[in-house]
Amino acid sequence: MGIFRRLVQSDSSQVYPFVFKITTTAANTVFTVPLVDYAGLTPSLTISWGDGSTSPLITSSSSTNRIHTFVAAGTYTITISGFMPGFTVNNNSAIRALITELVQWGIVGLRTVNFYGCNNLTSIPGSSSLSGVGGYTGLGEVLSFASFMRGTRLTSIPSDIFDYSPYATTFSDTFGSILTLTTVPTGLFDSVTGATTFASCFFGCTALTSVPSTLFDQNVNATNFSGTFRNCRALTNVLQFTNNQSVSTFANVYNMSSTSNALTGTAPTLWLRNPTPSGTAAFRNCTGLTNYASIPANFK
């Protein structure tokens, strides 16, 4: 199924907007849509603010027309139509708590997107519920999922969220610091075979208890697993990374802040690979591993 989906391209004749909701609790709340350029690409879009007003055409990520004042407190549906190469909240304290719901991705030409720090965002809509508005095909041109849902409060991840994103290479901090995430679905990264970095991908997911043993099996081009599961102290199983032979760094991949962690099983003998990848503190404090005593000092 993943291979089939990688071959599916967005129908350029279809135009669907990017839609999300914000909730304000005070009068005259100012909200700035977090537009960014990407690799020389600039926006060309309009914004319907959900209060009866619409912006003029915006052709710059720094345009003042991306800023809006909501006179009354309430919940507003913001609709972005046109071309938007980048939407990155980046933990912006002025807007992160205001975003409460992702309604649809639409098809707007996204290359990078993140809701980093949106701690009132608890779910990603399933692809079936979006079938009439582009599904997940609007993520088909995304190259970077860095900090994608970092610091949100997701309780689950749709297994097919990346199935239409064959060009994506960057998955650093993608689901980092999600304190409400307990499991990861099988096949999550199967379609992103060109991915090169999963650095800190699940860093600090302190409630995460298990991940599929095959999670990264298709990611043969990955070179960086630095800190991927760092401080995931409830995690019980350790991956072997058998198919990931191009990796140059596993530094801090399972680094735990203390020995009070649940990790068990046998550590992969990464230090025996040739060439030897960087493994600084890769298994620090992972004393529950059956071969912990034989792990070289520079890997723990």
Where are these regions (language model features)?
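Consensus positions within tandem repeat domains that build extended binding/scaffold surfaces
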Residues: 113-116, 143-150, 170-176, 197-203, ...
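Hydrophobic face of beta-strands forming the core of extended beta-sheets/solenoids
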Residues: 124, 133, 145, 157, ...
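Intrinsic disorder/low-complexity signature
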Residues: 8, 202, 216, 234, ...
